[in-house]
Swiss-Prot record:
It comes from Methanococcus maripaludis (strain C7 / ATCC BAA-1331). Pathway: Cofactor biosynthesis; thiamine diphosphate biosynthesis; thiamine phosphate from 4-amino-2-methyl-5-diphosphomethylpyrimidine and 4-methyl-5-(2-phosphoethyl)-thiazole: step 1/1. One of its GO terms (biological process) is thiamine biosynthetic process. The gene is thiE. One of its GO terms (cellular component) is cytoplasm. This is Thiamine-phosphate synthase. 2-[(2R,5Z)-2-carboxy-4-methylthiazol-5(2H)-ylidene]ethyl phosphate binds at T132, N133, T134, G162, V182, S183.
Length: 207
């Protein structure tokens, strides 16, 4: 299975909602195919401790494991990849240091899409499709913006930003390779059930 096939149901952690290890295990049981560790206000030691646990779980469930921003942590916990924003370490530099990592890059517009592609990103995280409480500085791209980038980009696209069970169909109709979800899964009262339901919706569009 190519890595692109595992981008379809991409869950990002947020300990404001739930414990990373608990929420990830439930999400994986429910069908999540990629996990990203995002711990913005934690120490490096904490990130490594949690990352080691998530690495074990993702291997057990045959899912991809990404670390947000932190190349050092991604390498220490033996992650499959890293996801970076436009203000983080350049994709080209990461490829020099860690050529085996899958590199995802955030793109909020065409210019950032072109930069990520030219630097050698493996996939794009495109959004915010809808307004979101989990990333308050995110710029809203909207469905039309997502469609435009999807048509022009040669890379697999993971849509992100405010995606939930009621709007995911509109996102999937844009022809993306996957959807990244935060609060709709890790903030759910029943994470397992929420993940199972989301997985069923995604499978209607991405086999």
């Amino acid at each position: 299975m190519k890595f692109k096939d595992k981008l379809k149901f991409y869950v990002i952690t947020d300990n404001n909602y739930s414990n990373e290890v608990v929420s990830v295990e439930e999400a994986l049981k429910g069908g999540a195919s990629s996990i990203q560790l995002r711990m913005k206000n934690s120490t490096t030691r904490e990130m490594i401790e949690v990352g080691n646990e998530l690495r074990k779980l993702t291997l057990e469930y045959d899912a991809l494991f990404f670390v947000n921003d932190r190349l050092d942590v991604a390498q220490v916990v033996n992650a499959d990849g890293i996801h970076v924003g436009i203000d983080d370490m350049p994709v080209s530099k990461i490829k020099e240091i860690a050529p085996n990592l899958i590199i995802g890059a955030s793109a909020y517009n065409m210019e950032e899409m072109k930069t990520a592609e030219s630097e050698g990103a493996d996939y794009l995280g495109v959004g915010a499709v809808y307004s979101t409480n989990t990333k308050l500085d995110a710029r809203n791209l909207g469905i039309d913006g997502l469609k435009s980038i999807s048509k022009l980009s040669k890379l697999p696209i993971v849509a992100i930003g405010g995606i939930n069970h009621s709007n995911v169909q509109n996102v999937l109709e844009c022809g993306v390779s996957g959807v990244a979800v935060v609060s709709a899964i890790v903030g759910a009262e029943n994470i397992l059930k929420s993940a199972e339901n989301m997985n069923e919706l995604i499978k209607k569009y991405i086999k």
